[in-house]
Regions:
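Class I SAM-dependent methyltransferase Rossmann-like catalytic core
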Residues: 49, 54-78, 82
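Conserved beta-strand signature within the Rossmann-like core of class I S-adenosyl-L-methionine
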Residues: 184-192
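Conserved Class I S-adenosyl-L-methionine
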Residues: 201-223
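A short acidic, Gly/Pro-enriched loop at the edge of an enzyme's catalytic core
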Residues: 153-164
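A short SAM/SAH-binding and catalytic strip from SAM-dependent methyltransferases
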Residues: 162-176, 191
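Class I SAM-dependent methyltransferase SAM/SAH-binding core
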Residues: 97-100, 104-154
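N-terminal auxiliary segments of SAM/dcSAM-dependent transferases
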Residues: 1-52
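C-terminal helical/coil "lid" or tail adjacent to the Rossmann-like core of SAM-dependent
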Residues: 233-248
Length: 248
């Protein structure tokens, strides 16, 4: 069955809803054409501090190579399970509206889409990232989703559109997250654990350090659950360069 079309976006210039399939247009006639790879550029030029914001093309390529090799498979499966467990659509027969803020090249989204397909649950997935090379890859790899180049701190997403918001290792834009989530919506916030990539740090640094882990209260949000995902992987020499290059 072909998925129903959906448009999660609002105009980044005036905030009005965007409508359309390939060409998006708002009520004030601002228009945005879909790139050939299947994404929209919804980051206004005046909001770009550099010519190519976000992760570089080289970093994106390295991350894609490493993730596609399956080393983070345990994490991808856990994300799918969490989204199935915590995602609740607004209506009984409605698809889940899932928004990935800081989607990167979309590997996590593909894991989630696979989990929903296997569970027979409908999902409408949208994601954005400030790095155009990453969004280009995400859109090509998962055509059923909607992707845009955009900033977390000025999200071109309709107010209250998201049932479930995913934020993996990306900046926490508290006010915008609260705006785009519907009342009663939920967020999955992923942060690195204390020993995330610790073995790699032990190779790189004379005095390796653990990531600080602390409880942080975010206004408008309350914790309803926590899950720690851990595992040990063996990375062959040929993939070490990709692991180093993908890490900021």
């Amino acid at each position: 069955m072909k998925p129903e079309p959906f448009t999660p976006w609002q105009c980044p210039l005036c905030g009005e809803p965007l409508t359309g399939d390939t060409a998006l247009k708002c009520g004030r006639n601002h228009s945005f054409d879909r790139a050939k790879e299947g994404y929209w550029h919804l980051l206004p030029v005046q909001s770009m501090r550099t010519k190519a914001p976000g992760d570089s093309k080289e970093m994106v390529a390295a991350r894609r190579a490493f993730l596609n090799a399956g080393y983070y498979g345990i994490f991808g499966r856990a994300l799918g399970e969490l989204c199935l467990a915590y995602g609740a659509a607004a209506g009984a027969d409605a698809p889940l509206h899932l928004l990935d803020a800081g989607c990167g090249e979309g590997w996590y989204d593909r894991c989630i889409a696979q989990a929903f397909a296997q569970a027979g649950r409908p999902v409408q997935l949208a994601g954005f990232d400030i790095a155009k090379p990453a969004v280009r890859l995400a859109a090509k790899a998962l055509p059923a989703a909607k992707y845009a180049v955009a900033s977390s701190f000025a999200q071109p997403v309709r107010t209250g559109w998201a049932d479930l918001l995913l934020n993996c290792f990306s900046p926490f834009a508290q006010e915008e997250f609260r705006r785009v989530l519907r009342p009663g919506g939920r967020m999955i916030y992923v942060v690195p654990g204390a020993e995330h990539l610790y073995q790699m740090k032990a190779v790189l640094y004379d005095t390796p350090y653990k990531n600080p882990v602390q409880e942080v209260a975010y206004e408008g949000f309350r914790p309803i659950g926590e899950r720690e995902v851990s595992g040990r992987i063996t990375v062959p020499a040929g993939q070490l360069e990709a692991l180093f290059a993908m890490t900021p």
